[in-house]
């Protein structure tokens, strides 16, 4: 199957290139047009139906007209001269709020409308909420409907913001905006320029790495071009699959997929390029098309194994209960499978067309490069494996020490969001009112005895909630039209996005609800703090299930690939150390050094899957090469030295490219994105340079042939291959010879 695909691609390269060009452009355009219809920004929507906050959301939708795609924001209106609001000012604020509610906000504007652009035009829901006790400001609630991550929806909010500012400024009033869309848009604006610069820098770094390694402009540009085409097709396939299957993606998934595809796609092209150059060097009489066919057939199996390892790792997310995790698995799997098909077709086709011109103007096809760091590293690992093992474990252990005292952060604070105008407005509100006034915790009561609800019937529950330590205020009870449901808004003194508010809701508030629930009723607690309190429970449950299932599945794959019981154990232990070190380092940086409330709740699972899957890829490459070298005559340690010498350049280059790709996320606008980017980049670097180039070969040198127990490699007869003497180290190859099957 693999050789059939690569064979056709190298026999008919122009057909394959044309097909991918059309397919990539079409699917990329489709994905960009529909991506925001396939994403769900509400984290609560990903909770299983049996969680308390999810039940509260259903009551809010059924009895109080709440909409799942509604985006509430808060507008602060105050006098521009800093004086307290007068009664006339309050009347004017309320009158302008009514006018804003009647005035439609148009987006896109008629002059800016593009074909297939989605119309976000709507009338906002604007209502007065409360005046500060010192009359320093009055708050309005604003509700706009749509996906807050959609640029069109963000432009709609910007248009409303300008309308509101202009309307109140005419009367000498200033405005501030916070919560919901205000937070999202301000954070996006704060990080927009930086994200663009970082993206450009990432591409430049990848290009420079390729130029330095291959001394060729084509070898630098063509991989990026190929990966961009395949990545566009993959993104469109993911969005299309999500829409057809009726599942919602998390807004961060498309961005994460793009980074993953750039990283692994260039990695796969690198594996082909290294072997292609080696093939052309060793057989100068062979045509470029024939060399491409031979290389793609051999390396294609290694690429397939690497891709299927990632797919298998992320497929374990199917057992997760939290929907954000459960949909991430299929999305990554579909994207990686598309990249795999492209790696077996488009990439070999490009090699076949480019031939020896791929490495112009480099003289690398004629001159053998001098052995450098890789050869010295291989010799050092072979001569002093115990020292290398101790040093590697000490480094990983020191980083893993950061796990002590690590906490999970289930909020949405941090990053640029804490330095925006929305954050400043929230701080101003919190100085005069409970922090939860703009994002209350809702207690929803439904009658189950066939009767109706009254404020008097719920008076005991409201009093109990008022008495809870940490509750700043309890709003009057609101009844549904048919009086079968009621809502009691609770305003915590802590920011609903903070751990204190989540602890309050999951503990004292729910305890008070359970103890004072009126007979014949059912009570659920909802709101931001309640949602993230429930997410914490779901994530804790999923981590206990997904971790062992993923580890077992990857171990099974290694058993099949390496044909050994001991080698997979060695590789998985090393990868486990790498994961612990990476997560510990992330806690040291974000929680302890930067003072964040903890590491993002998605980080351990996403990091585990990426570090284990991608780290296993590199370990497969070095492990397979060690086995190949041990089949030759000579000492086991000499075989390890040769394996490191030949494979380290490919692993190092691939690791740097992948780390640069993920590292671009580390300076993104969101705290969660920053943490995933930093941690994954660090984990990949540790996997490449500490695990695959140092620790695993050193362990293999210590264990010798017994590492392949119970099926040691069949050693060829003949004299031992001598290790290169120092004076001779100028004629050996540094190429990674990936042996497969």
Residue ranges, per PLM feature:
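Structured non-transmembrane domains adjacent to transmembrane bundles in polytopic membrane proteins
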Residues: 49-71, 80-181, 405-592, 596-598, ...
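Short hinge/gating elements
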Residues: 41-44, 412-413
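N-terminal extramembrane/targeting module of integral membrane proteins
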Residues: 75, 79-82, 383, 397, ...
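Short, conserved active-site loops that position catalytic residues or coordinate cofactors/metal ions
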Residues: 36-40, 71-77
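Membrane-embedded transmembrane helical bundles of large multi-pass transporters/channels
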Residues: 1-40, 125, 145-408, 518-520, ...
């Amino acid at each position: 199957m693999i050789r059939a695909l690569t064979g056709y691609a190298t026999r008919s390269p122009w057909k394959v290139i044309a097909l991918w060009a059309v397919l990539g452009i079409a699917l990329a355009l489709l994905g960009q047009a529909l991506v925001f219809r396939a994403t769900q920004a509400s984290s609560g929507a990903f909770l299983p139906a049996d969680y308390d906050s999810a039940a509260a959301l259903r009551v809010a939708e059924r009895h109080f007209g709440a909409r799942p795609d509604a985006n509430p924001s808060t507008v602060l209106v105050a006098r521009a001269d800093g004086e307290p609001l007068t009664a006339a000012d309050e009347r004017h604020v309320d009158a302008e709020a009514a006018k804003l509610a009647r005035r439609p906000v148009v987006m896109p504007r008629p002059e800016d409308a593009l074909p297939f652009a989605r119309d976000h035009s709507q009338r906002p829901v604007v209502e007065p909420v409360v005046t500060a006790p010192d009359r320093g400001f009055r708050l309005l609630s604003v509700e706009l409907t749509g996906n807050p991550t959609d640029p069109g929806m963000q432009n709609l909010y910007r248009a409303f913001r300008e309308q509101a500012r202009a309307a109140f400024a005419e009367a000498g009033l200033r405005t501030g905006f916070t919560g919901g869309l205000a937070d999202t848009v301000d954070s996006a604006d704060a990080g927009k320029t930086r994200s663009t610069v970082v993206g450009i820098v990432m591409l430049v770094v990848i290009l420079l790495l390729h130029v330095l390694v291959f001394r060729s402009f084509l070898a630098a540009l063509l991989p990026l071009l190929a990966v961009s085409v395949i990545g566009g097709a993959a993104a469109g396939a993911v969005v299309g699959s999500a829409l057809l299957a009726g599942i919602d993606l998390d807004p961060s998934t498309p961005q994460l997929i793009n980074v993953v595809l750039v990283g692994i796609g260039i990695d796969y092209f690198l594996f082909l390029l290294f072997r292609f150059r080696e093939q052309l060097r060793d057989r100068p009489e062979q045509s470029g098309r024939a060399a491409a066919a031979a290389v793609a057939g051999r390396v294609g199996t290694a690429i397939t194994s690497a891709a299927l390892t990632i797919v298998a790792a992320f497929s374990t997310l199917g057992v997760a209960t939290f929907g954000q995790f459960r949909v991430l698995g299929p999305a990554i799997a579909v994207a990686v499978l598309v990249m795999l098909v492209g790696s077996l077709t488009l990439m070999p086709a490009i090699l076949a067309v480019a031939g020896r011109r791929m490495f112009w103007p480099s003289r690398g096809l004629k001159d053998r490069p001098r052995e450098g760091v890789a050869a010295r590293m291989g010799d050092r690992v072979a001569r002093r494996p115990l020292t290398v093992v101790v040093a590697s474990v000490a480094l990983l252990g020191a980083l893993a020490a950061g796990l002590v005292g690590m906490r999970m952060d289930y909020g949405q604070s941090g990053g640029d969001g804490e330095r925006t105008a929305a954050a400043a407005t929230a701080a101003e509100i919190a100085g005069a009112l409970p922090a939860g006034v703009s994002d209350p915790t809702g207690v929803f009561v439904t009658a189950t005895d066939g009767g109706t609800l009254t404020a008097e019937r719920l008076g005991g529950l409201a009093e109990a909630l008022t008495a809870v330590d940490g509750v700043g205020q309890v709003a009057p009870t609101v009844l549904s039209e048919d009086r079968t449901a009621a809502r009691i808004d609770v305003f915590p003194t802590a920011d609903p996005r903070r751990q204190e508010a989540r602890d309050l809701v999951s503990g004292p508030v729910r305890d008070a609800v359970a103890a004072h629930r009126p007979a014949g009723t059912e009570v659920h607690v909802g709101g931001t703090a309640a949602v993230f309190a429930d997410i914490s429970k779901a994530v804790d449950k999923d981590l206990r299930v997904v971790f062992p299932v993923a580890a077992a599945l990857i171990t099974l794959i290694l058993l099949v690939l390496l044909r050994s019981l001991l080698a997979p154990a060695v590789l998985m232990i090393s990868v486990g150390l790498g994961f612990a070190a990476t997560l510990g380092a992330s806690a040291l940086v974000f929680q302890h050094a930067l003072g964040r409330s903890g590491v993002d709740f998605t980080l351990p699972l996403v990091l585990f899957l990426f570090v284990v899957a991608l780290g296993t890829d590199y370990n497969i490459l070095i492990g397979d090469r060690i086995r190949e070298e041990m089949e030759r005559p000579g000492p086991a340690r000499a075989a390890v030295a040769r394996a490191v010498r030949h494979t380290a350049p490919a692993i190092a280059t691939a690791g740097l490219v992948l780390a640069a790709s993920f590292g671009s996320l580390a300076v993104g606008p969101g705290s969660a994105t920053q943490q995933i980017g930093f941690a994954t980049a660090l984990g990949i670097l540790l996997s490449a340079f500490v695990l695959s180039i140092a620790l695993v070969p050193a362990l293999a040198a210590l264990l010798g042939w017994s590492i392949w127990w119970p099926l040691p490699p069949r050693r060829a007869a003949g004299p031992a291959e001598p290790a290169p003497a120092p004076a001779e180290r100028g004629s050996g190859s540094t190429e990674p010879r990936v042996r497969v099957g």
